[in-house]
Amino acid sequence: MVSMQISDSLKQKAEKCGIALSHYDIDGHLIFADEKTVSTFVELLQPPPKAKGQFDDVLAAFENEPIDYRLNRLDLPPSAEYRYQLTDESNAILLEKILSNLSVLSLPPLPFGYYQLSIFSDTEQYRIRLLISPKTAFQPPVLENKKVWGVNVQLYSLRSEQNWGIGDFGDLAYLIEQSAKQGADYVGINPLHLPYPAVPNWASPYSSSSRRWLNFLYLDIPDLPEFKRCRSVQNWFKREDIQAKIAALRESDCVDYSSILALKLTALEPLFDFFQRSQSVEIVTRRKIFAEYLKNKGEPLLLQGLFNVLDLQEHADHQAEENTIGWLGWRKEWQHLSAAKRKALLKTHHEKIQFFAWLQWLTEEQLSALQNLCKQSGMKLGIYGDLAVNSSRGSADVWSDPDLYCVNASIGAPPDPLGPVGQNWNLPPYNPTVLKARGFAPFIDMLCANMQYFGVLRIDHVMGLFRLWWIPKGKTAADGAYVHYPFDELMAILAIESVRNECLIIGEDLGTVPDEVRWKLNEFQIFSYFVLYFAQRNGEFPRISDYPRNAYATIGTHDVPSLQSFWHCRDLELFNQLGILNGEVLKQKYDQRVMDKQALLNSLHRDNYLPPHYEGDALSMAMHDYLNRMIHYYLAESNSRLIGVQLENLLSQEISFNLPSTSNEYPNWCKKLAQPLAFIFSNEALKTFFVQINQGRNV
């Protein structure tokens, strides 16, 4: 429903909260937000009650430039006498003076980082967080004069003779070493966000329990120091029945999350007991390191452990739906804890909480070792990680800090011709008002947790730093409105953490991106995300010189089919079989696919990647090795400084890791690669494939 009937008072409140009263749809039509929706969001976005430690304002500025802070942002009573103090992150006082000018406070240029500006009178104190940003996000030196490539995988999909039925950090180590030998400068993986141990089949890495904590299911257990010293667990592992179980899990074409989690916990629980009581010098030393880890991570680490303990009790049957996942399905008394109840539960479940904290420590330890392995292997970038838009509604993140999220709203996408009813992702948005009052500390912590072990970080739906489509609880996506976020401040933080962690940022910017957002992303040198499947314009694919330079280019993504499957329309067949697409809509999809394929063939002919006599009819031509290689070679020669090669495409495998618009109808997030890693890196044809990619990049 479109409406302009919004009172002036509500308009002013909405604009102050960043709620867009209108937007242009994909066809250029002006759509007005519904008054009821606007009113609901205004209520959700009211400033929190002023609390100790809260910031009154936040200002973003560039490093090494003079800073003018305009005091009308604070509404200071003019009758009082004020002084100000500037402190850095270590609380060292950099400046302390009497405030003589009540209009502008001028500060000297500062190095990049976080600062606090405090303004005092005898009765009042105002706290302003300064976000002093580098001019750009981190730019790896290797990209100054080289076009690089890497391999991208869904980590869980890897096969080997060593893993326990799911690709793990041991497989990732092998992939890093072998890819580096072939000339790759990074290995890209799916998000490693913590899932729900109580409901292991809720496996989407884009709908996790926490974006701050890691998925311990990827642990390479035999590589743990505790495993190497614990004879009883080693003996258990060698048992014929256990080896048979592991072999069966390896053979399966889909990851059996429930069985693998149960098996890994059967090993990890006695290993934790061994870790606690062993008197060997190595384990005693490790206990001291773990104690320091607990101290540094503090209560947030313990709360994710408590969440897992309670969730395992409440979901003992390991089943949940979207409206009962995580804390949404718990008894009422545990859904919203008082400080006293939280403290009591932390004490009651201390031992089990320590176990989950230990699993986080082990996971971080192995991931850190993997990034070091990248450097030792000669990779210039290392691990390419992925950051989801947000955690899911029933998550540990939301439960442990409910004020930070608007749980009575969801994020998604407005209606468009491809999705006439819009999209509801059922992810609760950050409350930007609360985020700003906290000086963006939760956002900073989350970014740092994701960047510290990666050389590259892809940010899913980077537009979310600028605005998100909010949907009121109980309403459809069509009833939503855009809510703007403090873009300048979030970009400043992104640049600070990127440079500190030496992490290149890729912003997933598919779809319509406003000019002001595109300009800002370019200013900060955030790499664009360029997908071949979506690159066709007016019946042509771009020439290699027309590919954006500051971009990561790839054939597909986790949400689209592999090249083989795309070419043979297997995804459309699946959508038809599942009743998602049929009739005229399905026919349009098939027609569009043929047009895209023909356009790609024509463009490859145009640029001499295919010889003149080569078959050029997309309707009758099947995908085959030569065409596959030429598409990759075309991508490799493109102007983009970074390209990604997906292992499923090298293997010519027909696969869709995720089929959008499905949940239980299709085995999303569990399909495996057709061949083990050892085959991929010993196969002569694939070695030649890697040589061609290197040649294309070095042109």
From Swiss-Prot:
It comes from Haemophilus influenzae (strain ATCC 51907 / DSM 11121 / KW20 / Rd). One of its GO terms (molecular function) is 4-alpha-glucanotransferase activity. NCBIfam families: malQ. This is 4-alpha-glucanotransferase. PANTHER family: 4-ALPHA-GLUCANOTRANSFERASE DPE1, CHLOROPLASTIC/AMYLOPLASTIC (PTHR32438), 4-ALPHA-GLUCANOTRANSFERASE DPE1, CHLOROPLASTIC_AMYLOPLASTIC (PTHR32438:SF5). Its EC number is 2.4.1.25. One of its GO terms (biological process) is carbohydrate metabolic process. Belongs to the disproportionating enzyme family.
